[in-house]
């Protein structure tokens, strides 16, 4: 097994990356960046091209932000399309993201991001903009993602042959936190844990969850960009590990009506300029500082406007229904898993908020940018969150302003008209991203569902 990718005391530089490849026998490296949906798109690059790209960058067709997750071209975006003839966009390699791929003989792997004008529509760059804003306000972000995902005894071919019906789960039934299940499948668990450690994506906890074949993984906390990088790497290479074992993993928000949806919760905290918690106040009943109250209040206030950046697929809205461990309104509580935001009293080192509305299928960079941007907005405007929700939020009635959009289309319209969104993320980003979500809903509307056939075919 490969040794873990070491996190150097000083950032891993372009010179370090060049030296690493020069002193190796590798003829190629692998590079990748995410599209709007959070899918890693990349290629093998020769060492000579890599050396040049480290210094000058390289070109990638800007279709990477001009198509959907099925490579269908958007027809409603201004940034790129047939009207621009899909030119190349400049890309920079990020040497500090270097990993070694253990299943490719430790091949060097680097994340990248769009640069120059293309930064305006680059998911990773949008997060970086929010982190720069936080730094300008005297804060740094610590974040940790946790994911639920279903595992199947299927292959990409078999699920298509079955038309995604009657799939065989890795394990049957409800059996959360099962020692039996993780012992029987210990080889798979250890391969996942070991691979992620080698990819500098340490898993703090891995266990079965509620549902057949469903697992939950908690990724170790890190700085903002590094946390989102790890989340992206975790999702991609979990699917790689599964398929290399003739299995499949899905991070779809809700793949079946019979089971709860899959979350991608984010734990977040801010540190001040001295590296101390900006969220903790031991004198407060909930140990919340004024900064934390304002941060949570901003998230509560803006979540309805930013939901398209949080629930990014049509399917994600099937998860946001009562009784399935997912929030249904923009609310907060202390140690309350029925609200959108869960404040966790963790003392001076781990006082934090859990952003529970996040779905597993969301782009980590976009969702973290939305969550952070909303919180910073609350701090800037000294918003107050009101009283925390106590008890079961599903059984309570809340003000209309806390209601969440019910469809992706409605969420995209809220985002387009959001002044805070345009102020935080820029007009170019809001217009481009909202258009991609409108496209996604339009594609969905072209298809007839099984529910419609069963309900209307004979009776209506």
Regions found by a protein language model. Give the residues of each.
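Glycine-rich, acidic/polar active-site loops that bind/position phosphate-bearing ligands
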Residues: 2-460
